[in-house]
Amino acid sequence: MNRRGLILAYLVADWLSAAASWTLLFVYRKVMFEQSTWSDWPSCFDDQRYSLGLAIIPVFWWGMHALAGMYLKPLKRHRILEIGQVTWTTLLGVMVLFFALLLDDAIVSYKQYYASLSVLLVGHWTFTLFGRLVITTRTVKKIHSGEWSFPTLVIGGNERAVKTIEEINGLRKHPGYAFKGFIQANGADTSLDQFMPNLGKVDRLEAVIQSHEIEEVIIA
C-alpha cells in the first residue's frame, strides 16, 4: 500500500469511528433521557439532528486529527503514538463538542450531562483507537518484515558508516530502510561501495534526494 492509500485507510477508519460514537451517543440519549426503549433505536436514524451530526462531526474529527499531524507520516506511526494522540485529541475534541452541541440541551439533572460526556468520550476513544491500531499494527508488521520500506540515503562512506549499516542490517526486526545509496561526506570515503551505490559528493545532495525520492537520511 502506498502513502496515499494508507492515509485514505486512516481517513475511512476515523470517519467510521466518529459516526459510530455519534450514533452510540444519540441512541443512548434517546433511550435514557427521552423515554424511548431500546427497541425504538432505529427511529433515531429518522431524526434530522442525527443526520446533521453525522454530516458534521466526522469532518470535525478529521480536522482535529489533521491539526495533530496524524495523517502526515503514515508509515512512521506506531502503537504508543496512536494511544497518546488519540487520547489527547479525544479529550479536547469531546470537550469542544460537549460545549457546542450538548450544553444547551434540556436536562433533568446534571448527571445526564456527565453521562452523555462519558458515553461520547469512552465511545469515541475506543472506536478510534481500535480502528487506528488495526491499521498501524498491520503497517508495523509489513515494515518489520521488509515488505514495506522507505527510500533512505546515507551521508558518509567511511568505516564508521560501514559499521552502522552492518548494525542496521543485523537487526532482528527490519527498520524499514531501503538504501538507495550513499553520499561521500569528504569526497574520499568509499568503503560503503560494497553495500550500496555511490551517488556522489555532498554538493549533489539535494539533487540526489529529489531524483531518488528520499524519505530518510542517515548521517554515518
Residue positions per predicted region:
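Signature of alpha-helical transmembrane segments in polytopic membrane proteins
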Residues: 1-148, 215
